[in-house]
Amino acid sequence: MCAGFYVAVHPWLEAQSLHKVGHTGNLAARLHDGSYTTCFTDEWKYCFTLETSTKKDAQKIEAGVLYCAQFFRVKNKELVCLLPEKIKQLAEDVANCLDISYTLCDSPTYEMNDSTIVVEPSLPSDPLISKEKLRHLVITPVEDEEHFADDVLFFSTDETRTAIEDRLYQKEAANMGYQELRRSGRAILQMACRCGKTRVAYLILSNYLQGKVLYLVPGLSLLRQTLEKLYQYGISLKNVLLVGSDQTRIVLNHDNIEMTTNPVFIAKRIREAPSLLVIATYQSSTLLVDDFDLIISDECHRICGEWETRPFTHVLLNFKKGHRLFLTATPRYDTPLSMKNRELFGGVAFRYYLREGIEAGYVNDFELQMVAAPKLAHQPSNREETTKQIIVKQIIMALAYLKTNIPAPKMLVFTRDIKQARELYAELVDQGVYALIAHSTLPRQVILKTFTEFCSSKEPVILLNCRLFQEGVEVPELNAVFFAAPRHSPRDIIQSICRPLNKQVQKPHATIFLPLEVNTENVCLDRFSSIIPFADALASEDPRFYEHLLNPSEVAYPINWIGAHGSVSELLQLARHAIRYGTQGKIDRLTRSERLPWKAAFAELKRTVEICCRYPKINDGFHFGGATLRFDTWYKWVIKSYLQYKNKEPSSLEPYQVSDLESLQDWTTRGVGGPYPWEESMAFLETWLAQNKGELVAIDIHQGGWIGLDATPMERLSGVLTTVSQRDGRSYGKNKKLRPKKGFMIPPQQAEDLDRIFGKHNLKWRKDRVNGFLKEDEHGNYTGEPTCIQEAYRTFKEYVKTNPEYIEKYWPGYAKGKHKHQELPHIWESGLAPPRYKAFKDGNKQLIQRSPKKKDIKN
């Protein structure tokens, strides 16, 4: 008898890419016992075995393999969805880690006779194995397939060192990222695909090269690519350590370097080296020790997921030292462990939109083509078959559209799952379409061969996949992507869109195809529900698309419809309506304050501050993408979020937005506190009364606020007392004869301040009341004794005529017209002031451009 660990396969399981792992004390008899022959035919065979001296050793290997392949195991079964070569390597690694001697046998056959049929003694179901020893062997889940692609597809770039000129936004990103690291120890750089995040990371890590830097990447190919780029930028290989499972030597110019997974060597090198750059895969991060000054996590959205320790979260959750820099184009916020966690990830220190990269010429532009559902000659008997035939025809329509402009177009088709990819592939091939298919259950050599064939094809070709080529794979000649199934994750959508956006000389714009089950015979908003997540994701990366959705007549966008049976313009209008208002068509989803593109809204705020010398007023309007918006609503949201951020509360603002705000003149005083600072004005009032023997002298409370950033203390006091007078002029209680009013609205603390300051000088500031109501005549005119504030205004009106020196000193440039209180005269005259927002009873909203009257212009 021969004991051992085995991997067996049966045709029924092999069709699903499943393999049976197990252990036995009798390899010759195992595949002939009842558990194998009762439910299956006798077509079992061993892929390989590890013969061991005892059954207990074989059981330990099985337990170790199932632990390390836990993410690929069928629940409660000893079935693993991995290629035999991968399981073989894993089994040998487990045996070596557990110090178990074995003999490897590939595709063995064992002779079966009566002497081999022996009843095996039972063993404990859960053998004791050191999971700590095996933790570094745990295989990362392939739930999104792109991790698989990282290790399969790698195309070397030119590794020669060349002078590189940093782009302006890269310098800005590096500066803001480094400053945020110094301030809080953590920073996120959110930059669109293909905009040079690695270069920015290099500029930042250059500040830490006297110490130890860890650069984490999600796969072996990206590790090589990162090394090559850093080498081009000037990094010396003598201070570089590569941690990964590929033993192939990497040759760069005349230098060369190898990867390692030796935990003893890795720990010793990290601890003893005074300065070191470690580039490692997340999968190998459990081999590292916590001794770094800076940790860079590339494609950090892949860290997010369940709140548990796994290779991708190991460093994030267990390492305590060093600053943390996170790089991504698509942050992930929809998981238990998400990038909303400021303690772990920090905030976004720099943001660079996809549209910015396109307009700057670094990213290829693209168009959107929605593909209508074609009419079928024969209606299938079930819904699933109908959908499949419709999508096949839509793919063929999309390819035909590409061929009108490109001789040999290449199109990636993203499917819902591998099953759908196989079904579509079979249908397309049957219809004579040159189609290829790749998925993670295929051998690596097959995937690489398929991908190479796709890239080098001189004919129109389609490559079907689920998520294998969604991230990290460069296809310079790719012309289009087609979504054969809805995507709901913004990360998946943006990453997929970016696949064909490589910038190349004379390369035509890319095309994004969105199939819809819509035609003119049966149109309703629900038919557009599948594109709403897509539109939301794109609008967050492309402000131009956002503006187009608000008003397509003012902002053009390359979006069209192919295969429509009726009016294209009407279908596009319905699609835009569904995106903006949802399939119920009720709530405007786009004009919420938090959804306004930050750079555009902040630019208007900055313009108002720098040109108009003030912050927004309540009735300021904002013209964006043809939409009429109330700017004050967004401004109040900004102030609220800013205060939450400064108080270390959950906030919608990111560090780069806070930095923008704090760059504005007097932001923390006038921007946040408003034009009428209460405490500052009360201190000025108290000093004034003390110096002038209790005489308030002259205050203008009639024309409204003094809101300019250059306002004098007396002008600001006028604004404060104007507000006091207005609020004190409101009755409280119920009175049927008068229109209901809001009541006595001066806050108690402010009333106490006024009582204290005016009381010292026996000045009356409150209006007279009877039973809580103002003393008024039948016309609503106040009939009580004048307050000191009202008397001060009468004095002011006299001073305007008789005391110009006083007016010029405390109200410099004062004009009779009210425009002085709102804008500087030249701003008013030139029409640079923000337009006035007005909402009418019928729901209509307008922006009314402020224009001066002749009497408002001071000669």
UniProtKB/Swiss-Prot annotation:
Q: Does the keyword Hydrolase apply?
A: yes
Q: Name one GO molecular function term.
A: helicase activity
Q: What class of enzyme is it?
A: hydrolase
Return the PROSITE patterns for the record. HELICASE_ATP_BIND_1, HELICASE_CTER
Where is the short sequence motif DEAH box located?
298-301
Q: Which UniProt keywords apply?
A: ATP-binding, Helicase, Hydrolase, Nucleotide-binding
Record keyword Hydrolase present: yes
All residue ranges annotated as the Helicase ATP-binding domain in the record: 178-349
E.C. number = 3.6.4.-
Detail which positions bind ATP.
191-198
Q: Which domain of life is it from?
A: Viruses
Q: Name one Pfam family in it.
A: Helicase_C
Q: Which SMART domains match?
A: DEXDc
- Cite the Helicase C-terminal domain residue spans from the record: 394-553
For this chain, the family text in UniProt reads:
Belongs to the asfivirus helicase A859L family.
Q: Which PANTHER family match?
A: ATP-DEPENDENT HELICASE IRC3-RELATED, TYPE I RESTRICTION ENZYME ECOKI R PROTEIN
Write down what this protein is called: Probable helicase A859L
Question: Organism source for this protein?
Answer: African swine fever virus (strain Badajoz 1971 Vero-adapted)
